[in-house]
Amino acid sequence: MTLPVYSRADLSRIAILVALFLTAISTSVVAREFRAADTQSEDYPTVQALRYMGRVIAERSDDRLQIRVFHSRQLGEEKETIEQTRVGAIDLNRTNVALIGSFVPAMNVLAMPFLFRSIEHLEKVLDGPIGNEILSSFEPYGFVGLAFYDSGARSIYNSVRPIHSIADMKGLRLRVQQSELMSDMIRALGAEPIELPYGQVLTGLATKLIDGAENNWPSFVTTDHYKHAGYYTLTEHTMSPEVLVMSQKAWQSLSADDRQIFRDAAIQSSQFMRAKWKDLEERSRRQAEAAGVKIVTDFDRKPFEDAMAGIYAKAQRDPATAALIERIRKVE
């Protein structure tokens, strides 16, 4: 039997191919994929931020750790994905504080109406000791809080009439998040709250199941709600942020070094997201104006704030909640 004779160049090429093959096998064995959920569309700033975070984590872990982002409600509506994250079926989740407040009580404070004076006030709270304390409060409930994302200011829009006073709210059927706090707020303003999953709002507007809803500029425009609701009143009643959480199950499986990689990447993604958000917010408002949406800025704000007295009285029965609200108000 005659054995094949290989040249030095052939042997070199074979060695390279074997090395690449072994590297591929090694990578496939040690690489781990984390599933991240976001109900927003693919080009939304929070989805882009999750992908940015994934790139940072992959780079810092030499591709051992990978994030796969599921957007556009691919893993379910937001409340469903929160529950899946709590039990460990989803590893990472971007969610609004009003929804996760059903699981983590401290988050309801950030969703309180008319609590923040401005976006700058909000960011000072989130970036400081209070924000860190709130993120730490997730752990007893099956989550690990990693970072806050911006969500702008939520305002009320509808298809029936411009809202200049609280009297104009009477009788309007307004979609709210699946949150007791949000339902109480709309009811206190004289309207009828209709709890609907985010993905059903457009159909609800088109079929007149609801008269309107409340959300920020990008959500109003990117979902095409502006095509069915021609009045947008700058109530800016809440400035509740988004929050990025990880399941306790996934977190406990990480080494101390890898946990730090995730924390650092999450903070970086928050800054990345804020820049993307501010640009989209401006473009969304211009698009709504160009489409003929009537933007109401001259509404009587004080009666709206006064109507929240009962909501605050209920929340402040808990001494810890009352103290947190007071601390937030004192941040300059």
Residue spans of the language-model regions?
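Bacterial Sec-dependent signal peptides at the C-terminal "C-region" and cleavage site
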Residues: 26-32
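N-terminal secretory/targeting leader peptides
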Residues: 32-121, 129-131, 136-332
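Bacterial N-terminal signal peptides
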Residues: 13-26
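Bacterial N-terminal signal peptides that target proteins for export
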Residues: 2-16
